[in-house]
Amino acid sequence: MEKSERPLIKKKRPFRKKKRSFRKRRSPIESGHQIDFTNTSLLNQFISQQGKILPRKVTRLTLKQQRFMTSAIKQARILSLLPFVFDDKKVKKKQKEEFQKKQKEEFQKKQKEEFQKKQKEEFQKKQKEEFQKKQKEEFQKKQFQKKEFQRTKSTARTTNEKQTNEKQTKSTARTTNEKQTKSTARTTNEKQTKSTARTTNEKQTKSTARTTNEKQTKSNDRTTDLRTRKK
């Protein structure tokens, strides 16, 4: 019988954690080292009235926090026992310098703000004045152009009126001259016709009178001749 082939299974390696030290070694505390007081209410819980660290049941989560607390308490206790000399003059001098520096900075800041504000106001005022001046000039220019246009319009109107008046006067003069010439021509024609008619009438009357006189004289002469012959 043949052996059944099974898939090769890798052997599981045992999971081993690296050994870690329970507490890290710290450098010895000296004067000037910084103490980290993160939570004062928690510190008060761990310290008794006599200044001793109280034993507490610690869980795995709060272990790290308690370690930091105990180290901070120990540091504070050691530092409080170290011989620090409190120099009041130096402290006061430092405080005075800090206060003067702060006041100087505030004064400089205030001065700077006032100067900037003043500059801004002057710039805005200048801009406003320039804008108003520009607007005024444009308005005056428009007004001048308007007046010029009205003047040219009025002059054009007056010239047109003058031209029309001249044309009217010329036309009226022409018509009056024509009328006068026509009337004079008519009157002269009438006078001529009247005079010619009068002269013709006079001539006709004279000729007729002459002819009648001649006829009468002839007839009278004939009658006288006949009378003389009868006698």
From Swiss-Prot:
Family stated for the protein in its record: Belongs to the bacterial ribosomal protein bS18 family.
Subcellular location as annotated: Plastid, Chloroplast
Listed name of the protein: Small ribosomal subunit protein bS18c
Compositional bias ranges of the Basic and acidic residues kind: 95-151, 159-169, 212-231
Basic residues bias spans: 9-26
GO BP: any one term: translation
Gene symbol of the encoding locus: rps18
Region (Disordered): 1-31, 95-231
Source organism (scientific name): Jasminum nudiflorum (Winter jasmine)
Gene3D superfamilies listed in its UniProt record: Ribosomal protein S18 (4.10.640.10)
Keyword ATP-binding carried by entry: no
